[in-house]
Design a protein with these regions (language model features):
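Bacterial N-terminal signal peptides that target proteins for export
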Residues: 2-11
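Bacterial N-terminal signal peptides
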Residues: 10-20
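Bacterial Sec-dependent N-terminal signal peptides
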Residues: 24-41
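Extreme N-terminal leader/anchor segments
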Residues: 37-73
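Aromatic-lined, polymer-binding surfaces characteristic
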Residues: 54-58, 67-280, 288
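Carbohydrate-active enzyme catalytic cores, enriched for enzymes
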Residues: 244-421, 619, 628-638, 652-700
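Catalytic and substrate-binding regions of extracellular carbohydrate-active enzymes
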Residues: 341-582, 589, 602, 632-640, ...
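Trp/Gly-enriched beta-strand surface patches
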Residues: 571-624
Length: 700
């Protein structure tokens, strides 16, 4: 679906929403609900007047008390946080977890002492200067709104008025803050807090309806179309940052649905109906620290160590599972969620209390599909099985939308027990030298470099220093973050942002095939085409065929692999071992390839300069494997076979290539693959069957 189609859909939805909104406003004082609004996940949801009673954001006091009886173990942990744990360390309890826990216990048990303490914590925000710009001012409003609603009787009239004033001043000061709807901050830094504050103060702050309506219209006309475009299939083009904002935004969606029956989900079904499944695929196999799952690295941030966003990802999936509870795929996600039933941060016990609903039917996880495609972001995820020791694969070939994306089309991840091929670099400072010259650049990824000595890069993340020539993909957008404001802006400059195409996707069970065209991600002055075809033969073999044509034969081409650990062995056959996992790397083409292992002090060095990180936030690839042809040519073909195994495995079948004027054939054990040289295509012979490689997207 094109960007213009999304905008047309948004205008229709806006008209319907304004009509329904007007109907609700007229009937606000009535107790009977207005006409039902269609809902994708559940039936019988109606638009209705907002209750005048407090609490209302998460339910009435009686409903919360009933929930405490239904979920006694989780509620006991909430009480423990409220009464015994101090806020501070985000791996124990942050201010948000502490405040909402205290407020819930106040509402459920009538604990006035906790109530007063929670109000005092809220007043520290209210009496402080309003935060403006790229700050989490929406979080501040949300924390205060939850305490306001759950502890309403404990607020004095003066304190309530101060909150209303603080809320209004925050909104007025941030009219021009966080306006980019492809960026996490529109949702997490800003509007979830606006929404909670408006519903909490609906009858007391006369500006609440106006503020909420502005947020609603911005969501309908700009944010929902962005979710449909860049989030089609449930992945999110911004990457890893979805783990930072999706929980807060879906928290608001649930509050809006509960308070007045407004359904945010129906406005972007391509995103919301697929998000929980995509999130499940965006976790490496294996249960790790604090009984959590590690999200895969996508763009900025890599999730190498346990952090609170792992609990956010779990809770966001739970919210969607609860809503789409009758959908078989979401019942499978529920089974997946139940393998990590308790949040990893003690202070997040309230998340288990509110969102973990064990009454949802469990689906058959082991029988579920083994791959998923998110066309909006250009992500393919795949596994060998749903066992915890499965081989994992991720491939990116998608368009540009916003900051936090990397110049990494054609990049892939492989994991077996541990990460074997990952994302290079350390994310610790946005816009710093390491960030601009290494982390976000193609050189930090498993893709292709084409070195034009005259190529230059400018205006990346407002960095004022020198920018190196890594030979990678270009950064040629009007905004220094490479960001489009919204779908209209993206569509207006489509020729700049539409930089890659997923050409084929097919999963036949025994193998998965993907193909992508990454050509437009590079400067047209140096590259004519770069296409990548990958066949994942389960359980652990990857055949990667790349066609690359440069404008000048002397532009050196380099096939890159970001290896988790320095390889052993001797080129063209290398072995990467990380913990219990092992990756065998066979360079089949080009013949007599030049292979360089960039490790140690050379890992972050290119062009005679080092861009080593000043901080380490977690384990990252320790070797950059570079494979180049031994002689210059305009056209080069790269053929690699990567096999992921247990570290106890000592050898794998050797790949043999046969090259003709029109085809490249790779024989690997009982499998044979043929790739055409003049265009993306070919066939696979496996298990006695010869099958053409798909020429299009073939979804399940």
């Amino acid at each position: 679906m094109s960007g213009s189609t999304y905008l047309q859909k948004a205008l229709v939805l806006l008209c319907l929403s304004v009509f329904c909104w007007a109907g609700c406003a007229k009937k606000e004082k009535e107790s009977t609900p207005v006409q039902a609004v269609s809902t994708p996940g559940q039936t019988g949801i109606t638009r209705h007047a907002i209750s005048k009673e407090h609490p209302r954001l998460l339910g009435s006091r009686q409903e919360l008390q009933d929930l405490a009886e239904q979920r006694p173990e989780a509620y006991a942990r909430v009480v423990g946080v409220a009464r015994n744990i101090e806020a501070g360390d985000q791996l124990i309890a942050d201010r948000h977890g502490k405040m909402i826990s205290m407020a819930l216990v106040c509402a459920i048990d009538g604990d006035n002492e906790l109530c007063k303490q929670a109000v005092q914590m809220a007043m520290k925000y209210i009496e402080a200067p309003v935060r403006v710009g790229h700050e989490t001012f929406g979080h501040d409003l949300a924390n205060c709104a939850l305490v306001y609603d759950l502890c309403y009787p404990c607020w004095t009239e003066e304190e309530r008025l101060k909150f209303h004033d603080y809320m209004n001043r925050t909104v007025d000061a941030n009219v021009n803050s966080e306006t980019h709807v492809f960026h996490n901050a529109w949702y997490g830094y800003k509007h979830w807090g606006y929404g909670l504050a408006c519903y909490a103060t609906w009858y007391e702050n006369e500006r609440a309806p106006e503020i909420l309506e502005t947020t609603r219209q911005d969501y309908i006309t700009r944010a929902a179309p962005a979710l449909e475009l860049a989030g089609d299939g449930g992945g999110w083009a911004e990457g890893y940052y979805i783990n930072y904002w999706s929980y807060e935004w879906m928290f608001f969606c649930e509050v809006a649905r509960r308070c007045e029956g407004f359904d945010c989900y129906e406005l972007a079904p391509r995103f919301y109906t697929n998000r929980a499944v995509a999130s499940m695929f965006e976790a490496y196999p294996g249960i790790r620290e604090n009984n959590s799952r590690r999200p895969i690295p996508m763009g900025d941030s890599g999730g190498q160590k346990f952090r609170p966003e792992r609990d956010k990802a779990l809770s966001a999936r739970r919210i969607l599972v609860n809503f789409f509870r009758d959908d078989p795929a979401h019942q499978v996600v529920h089974a997946f969620n139940e393998t990590t039933p308790v949040s990893g941060v003690p202070g997040n016990a309230y998340k288990d209390f509110l969102w973990r609903d064990t009454t949802v039917n469990k689906g058959d996880l082991k029988a579920f599909k083994l791959s998923h495609f998110s066309p909006g972001a250009g992500y393919v995820y795949a596994r060998s099985s749903w066992d915890e020791d499965a081989t994992y694969f991720y491939f990116k070939c998608g368009d540009r939308f916003t900051a936090h994306q990397h110049l990494d089309n054609g990049h892939f991840l492989i994991c077996k027990y541990e990460e074997l091929a990952g994302d290079g670099g350390q994310y610790y400072y946005f816009g710093g030298e390491h960030d601009v010259n290494y982390l976000l650049r193609t050189i930090a990824h498993s893709s292709i470099l084409v070195y034009d000595p005259d190529e230059t890069w400018t205006n990346i993340r407002a960095w004022k220093g020198a920018i190196g020539n890594d030979g990678g993909q270009m950064h040629d957008w009007p905004h220094h973050n490479g960001a489009a404001v919204d779908v209209a802006d993206w569509e207006k400059n489509r020729q700049l942002y539409d930089i890659a195409d997923m050409l084929a996707f097919e999963d036949r069970g025994e193998y998965l095939y993907v193909a992508g065209d990454c050509s437009r991600a590079y400067s047209p002055k140096k590259l004519e085409y770069f296409t990548r075809q990958i066949v994942f033969i389960r359980p652990g073999t990857f055949v990667i065929f790349d066609r690359v044509k440069s404008k000048d034969p002397n532009f050196r081409k380099t096939w890159q692999l970001q290896a988790a650990k320095p390889p052993t062995g001797k080129a063209p056959e290398l072995v990467i071992t990380n913990g219990r996992g092992r990756l065998f790397v066979q360079t089949v083409l080009p013949e007599k390839a030049l292979v360089k292992l960039n490790q140690g002090s050379d890992l972050y060095t290119y062009g005679g300069k080092s861009y080593a990180p000043e901080e380490e936030r977690g384990p990252a690839p320790e070797c950059r494997v570079g494979v180049s042809p031994s002689s210059p040519s305009a056209v080069d073909y790269f053929l690699h076979v990567l096999t992921a195994t247990d570290s106890a495995c000592s050898s794998v079948p050797q790949a043999v290539a046969q090259v003709t004027d029109t085809e490249v054939t790779a024989a690997l054990g009982e499998a044979k693959l043929v790739f055409t040289k003049d265009a993306v295509g070919g066939e696979i012979e496996i298990s006695g069957r010869r099958v053409p490689l798909a020429k299009q997207i073939i979804a399940e």
